[in-house]
């Protein structure tokens, strides 16, 4: 079954796919970052019965505009956010492999994961401000 056929049988049937290179499809869906940019989500067959959802490094690139992962603690927070959703970080790309019949739920879970990762800098500001008052 192709990725397009799998999407047709889910609530995501209104989503569109654009093939970016052979076997790699960009998901065109109404899923947006806080600034209005569309979340970059790519779908690839991982096996006959599973699909890889990934971002090809776009989430960490967005995060790097405002926030540096320059300490072991920040790296651990990032890794914890990703692993708590059952995903992995592969060469800068956040990846989640889901069974074909769980694609829609996987896309929704993945979009929440990307939102959490991209909002790490907000977490950092809140931690700094709360520590500021603790040290007064």
Predicted regions and their residues:
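Solvent-exposed, charged helical/coil patches
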Residues: 93-136
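Nuclease-adjacent, charged terminal/linker segments that flank catalytic cores
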Residues: 1-108
């Amino acid at each position: 079954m192709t990725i397009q056929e799998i999407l047709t049988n889910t609530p995501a049937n209104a989503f569109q796919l654009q093939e970016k290179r052979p076997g790699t499809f960009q998901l065109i869906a109404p899923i947006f970052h806080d600034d209005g940019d569309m979340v970059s989500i790519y779908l690839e067959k991982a096996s006959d019965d599973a699909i890889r959802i990934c971002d090809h490094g776009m989430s960490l690139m967005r995060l790097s505009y405002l926030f540096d992962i320059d300490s072991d603690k920040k790296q651990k927070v990032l890794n914890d956010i990703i692993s708590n959703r059952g995903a992995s970080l592969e060469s800068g790309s956040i990846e989640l492999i889901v069974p074909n019949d769980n694609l829609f739920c996987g896309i929704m879970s993945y979009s929440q994961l990307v939102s959490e990762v991209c909002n790490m800098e907000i977490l950092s500001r809140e931690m700094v401000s709360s520590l500021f008052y603790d040290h007064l």
